[in-house]
């Protein structure tokens, strides 16, 4: 696991904060219903981001912030009927050097050529029983090569418990979960939504999925504006050691591992209706680098990542990793 410390310095150059990635959820619903989806997509209504509004928000943000890669995701981003316009809006804003689509791939063979011509890379998440056939994967690889687009995929056999409906009243536990959260501090999954900037997608999605209302949602972020002090306020927000309000219900990187499964919409929230303490693995929560190093040895290899091509499912490496996943996943059920 990569090392991080709260307050690690961000690179600031020419008046802008730099980060590896930034994310935009162009839709919030999905064509799959994965249990414990970190974005709570199974219970969120249909919502399509407006390309013009997105361009405006990202253009203003770009004056104070820049990312190497802007991730276009959801939900399932390919459900957006105006995806070509979304991609052009993102490119026009110049908030990032490259554009990357994250998808479950089910709609990828039908993705418009205009999108292939604009996107730089595509990342596919494959789930047991709900994945593209090898023939369709091969078709997607051919389309990517024709348009000089990088394409990778991951097989997910396990998910982590992502949030708790009940949450916790233990401020020390909330702090520990926040301190060891990969999304906030290691991967820095910065998210732009409705003119607001969030430290991670979960801080925006959890209050929405739990129907807590706009006030509970937006107090986790910072509103994007063109004021002279916005960059400094953004930097202060990003490096704050204080947990966000949504961290009370979020499990960060500490959730127990569970076998991936699809659930009905009405089942999604009830299965999360347990206290935080029941849904985390104690050994995945800590405040020291040593604790993080120990946690790495517990995490099952829940995905297989390729380089610039699609690895065939018959590859013996995948079989070995799946056996390891099955063994490691069993450790997290106790």
Q: Where on the chain are the PLM-derived regions?
A:
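Conserved alpha-helical substructure of the radical SAM core
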Residues: 1-101, 106-110, 277-286
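N-terminal pre-core extensions flanking Radical SAM catalytic domains
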Residues: 1-41, 219-226, 239, 243, ...
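Short, P/G- and charge-enriched loop/turn segments at secondary-structure junctions
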Residues: 10-11, 175-178, 234-237
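Disulfide-bonded cysteines in secreted/extracellular proteins and peptides
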Residues: 30, 34-37, 181, 189, ...
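Short cysteine/histidine-rich metal-coordination sites, predominantly Zn2+-binding motifs
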Residues: 50-57, 261-273
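Conserved AdoMet/S-adenosylmethionine-binding subsite of the radical SAM
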Residues: 80-208
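C-terminal accessory region of radical SAM enzymes
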Residues: 148-161, 202-258
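Extracellular/mature segments of secreted proteins
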Residues: 189-193, 255-260
């Amino acid at each position: 696991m990569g090392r991080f410390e709260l307050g690690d310095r961000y690179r600031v150059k020419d008046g802008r904060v730099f980060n590896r990635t930034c994310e935009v959820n162009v839709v919030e619903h999905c064509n799959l219903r994965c249990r414990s989806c970190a974005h709570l997509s199974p219970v969120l209504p249909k919502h399509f981001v407006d390309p013009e509004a997105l361009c405006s928000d990202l253009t203003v943000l770009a004056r104070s912030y820049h990312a190497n890669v802007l991730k276009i995701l959801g939900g399932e981003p390919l459900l957006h009927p105006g995806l070509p316009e979304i991609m052009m809006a993102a490119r026009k804003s110049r908030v990032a050097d490259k554009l990357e689509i994250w998808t479950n791939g089910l709609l990828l063979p039908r993705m418009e050529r205009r999108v292939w011509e604009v996107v730089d890379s595509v990342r596919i998440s494959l789930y047991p029983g709900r994945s593209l056939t090898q023939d369709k994967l091969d078709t997607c690889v051919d389309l990517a090569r024709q348009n000089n687009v990088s394409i990778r995929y991951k097989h997910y056999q396990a998910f982590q418990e992502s949030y708790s409906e009940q949450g916790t009243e233990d401020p020390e536990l909330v702090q520990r979960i926040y301190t060891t959260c990969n999304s906030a501090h290691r991967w820095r999954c910065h998210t732009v939504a409705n003119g607001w900037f969030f430290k991670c997608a979960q801080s925006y999605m959890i209050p929405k999925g739990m129907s807590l209302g706009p006030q509970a949602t937006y107090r986790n972020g910072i509103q994007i504006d063109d004021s002279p002090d916005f960059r400094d306020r953004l930097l202060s927000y990003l490096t704050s050691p204080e947990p966000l309000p949504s961290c009370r219900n979020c499990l960060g990187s500490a959730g127990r591992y569970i076998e991936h499964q699809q659930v009905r919409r009405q089942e999604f929230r009830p299965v999360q209706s347990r206290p935080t303490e029941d849904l985390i693995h104690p050994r995945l929560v800590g405040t020291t680098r040593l604790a993080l190093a120990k946690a790495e040895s517990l995490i099952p290899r829940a995905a297989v990542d390729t380089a610039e091509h699609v690895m065939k499912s018959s590859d013996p490496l995948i079989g070995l990793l799946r056996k390891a996943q099955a063994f490691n996943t069993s450790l997290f059920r106790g």
